[in-house]
Amino acid sequence: MDYGRVYQLNRLMALAQGVSEEQYDKRETWYYDETDNVKHLVLLPEKRVNASENACFVLGGVQAEDIISDDELHTALGKEPGRELKSTKDLRGSFVEILRKDAFQRTFDLVESKRWNVHFIMVQVWYYAFVDVIDSICDDVMLAHNLKAILYRILKSSPEETVKLFGKYHYPDIKDKDKIVFLDGLEAKVLKFIGTVPNPPDKMMASILVKKINEAKKKEELTFIQDETPDEWVKMFVQFYSAEIYSYPNRTLVFDTEKQVEKLLTEDTIEVNGTKLNNYSFSDSATNPMIQVCDYVVSILRKYFIFVDRTLNEIVADIEKFDKQQMQRYRLLNKVLKRSLDNNPLFFHYIASVETQYNINQLMEKYA
């Protein structure tokens, strides 16, 4: 890959969307942890995939120029010195359930008091797995975003049927002889959805998808879902680490130790403008309190992103059931998110349905 070329394109695109040069090029330190990393999404020999339809990979944490000691972090989280800090222990349960956890309050009280910014890459794994279908049948970029969102909703609504259809034809390596029958199967799923969904806008978008599928049957090739690695729905997740490194060469990036990721990055020389990048390092969470903060932050974010991956009406119905404590903590989360986004739009990076992104933004504006 020509990383220098991709860096230039990413930078130009960000500037065109209103990001300032200062925001893009600023020298600052970003700390990272990850959650729900299935390494890649593949069809296994037993004809199932290695991640659920709700899988949500988050690589992120906090941007901070000041750090805290291990003792300070234990105090902030209300823990005895020397006690292990793990979000998996302190934040068990769904998003609604962890709003009752003391660790939720303490984590974002700390982030807010320090004025650290939250940053993340959020990947809806099943969404990312199927975007190439739309990119192969639709040339209209703006329309494609909405078609990807409705396709994602349709395919995750019946995951076993989806795995059966896509697995049968070894997606994303659809052979020429199977192209029509694969598209027929996809069309049948969309028509079934149209027959059951009550929302007129959803029916309309799904109907447009049917039209695009039928038009694709006349194409000579489906560019992005043929002649690819069979049964590999999403390539290795190391790509998300690489993207952070080459997109923002002025940043100092500190990742939680991940031996496989570290090995793969070592094998891949990342150069921008003729210079090999050394703007990143790996640090053991057991000895780096900032990585431990990120562990708590990304754990909460992942649960929140799953919570908002549905219709806005369904989400609001649940929010209206929050008790006083839950609502106070939910507002705190949105306050931190909004402050971070206002400081720099680049703190948030979505590979996700536009519907989910819309939900997050609407709720952030209302509850921050």
Located regions from the model:
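Phosphate-ester processing/binding pockets and catalytic centers
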Residues: 1-368
